[in-house]
Curated annotation (Swiss-Prot):
Native species: Caldicellulosiruptor bescii (strain ATCC BAA-1888 / DSM 6725 / KCTC 15123 / Z-1320)
Organism phylogeny: Bacteria, Bacillati, Bacillota, Bacillota incertae sedis, Caldicellulosiruptorales
Subcellular location: Cytoplasm
Gene: rsmG
Identification of the protein by name: Ribosomal RNA small subunit methyltransferase G
Main location: cytoplasm
Stretches of the chain forming a coiled coil according to its record: none
Length: 238
């Protein structure tokens, strides 16, 4: 696929032939399974390349910029069929990725996909993110947390920040107009031990799709009473 070649060149992905082969295989797995149950609203390959692959790979330069660990550990919350986490793993194999979703069908698919692709350093965790944030084996264990526009930022922060190590970064992928969400999330970010580090706005390559990535750094440990349960997080956001 010429468009995919261009996207991989744009993001300066290493070993592009190997990465391209795996990405196409993964895309085909998603589109085939999508006929049986809903994984994505996107059915066109070129649209998939832009809205899923290019969108996910937009994280790469920020991972490189913020990473002080040779083999960083990242968790993708609300991963769905594995976006952006599995795309990041394919393009940047040094990252150890946990794919988190509470939907059992989607988790089953992600496990099948990683086995089919023959990729190591990928773990699928089928659980609610706020439950993981209270478990010792997950709390404050990650260099990066990814989330793709799955909820409001003030809600996402209570799921994401407890999972980060001090010094780690939450990379929240949002639409272009995100200022109101950021304003509403400032209190939550402060309470949970974080700080807005930067807001990156850009257009996805070979498209007119506008995006933002909000980078939130963790400066101190999250208080032990967070995260709260889902009902409290959603109904009474910080």
């Amino acid at each position: 696929m010429e468009l995919l070649d261009k996207v991989l060149e744009y993001y300066k992905v290493k070993n592009p032939l190997v990465v391209k082969h795996l990405l196409i295989k993964y895309m085909n797995l998603v589109l085939e399974k999508n006929k049986l149950f809903n994984l994505t609203a996107i059915e066109n390959e070129e649209e998939f390349v832009i809205k899923h692959i290019a969108d996910s790979l937009s994280l790469l330069k920020f991972i490189e910029q913020e990473n002080s660990n040779q083999n960083p550990v990242a968790i993708d919350i609300g991963s769905g069929f594995g976006a952006p986490g599995l795309f990041v793993k394919i393009a940047m194999p040094s990252v150890n990725v946990f794919l988190n979703d509470s939907n059992k069908k989607k988790c089953k698919f992600m496990n099948e996909a990683k086995e089919s692709l023959g990729i190591s350093g990928v773990n699928v965790v089928c659980e609610r993110a706020e439950v993981l944030g209270r478990k010792e084996e997950f709390r404050e264990k990650f260099d990066f947390v990814f989330a793709r526009a799955v909820d409001r930022l003030n809600v996402l922060c209570e799921y994401a920040i407890p999972l980060l190590k001090v010094g780690g970064a939450f990379l929240a992928q949002k639409g272009f107009e995100c200022e109101d969400e950021i304003d509403l999330a400032k209190n939550a970010i402060e309470i949970l031990g974080g700080e807005i580090y930067s807001i990156e706005k850009f257009v996805l390559p070979y498209s007119d799709e506008k995006r933002s990535i909000i980078i939130i750094k963790k400066l101190r440990q999250t208080p032990s009473n967070f995260p709260r349960n889902t009902k409290q997080i959603v109904k009474k956001p910080l």
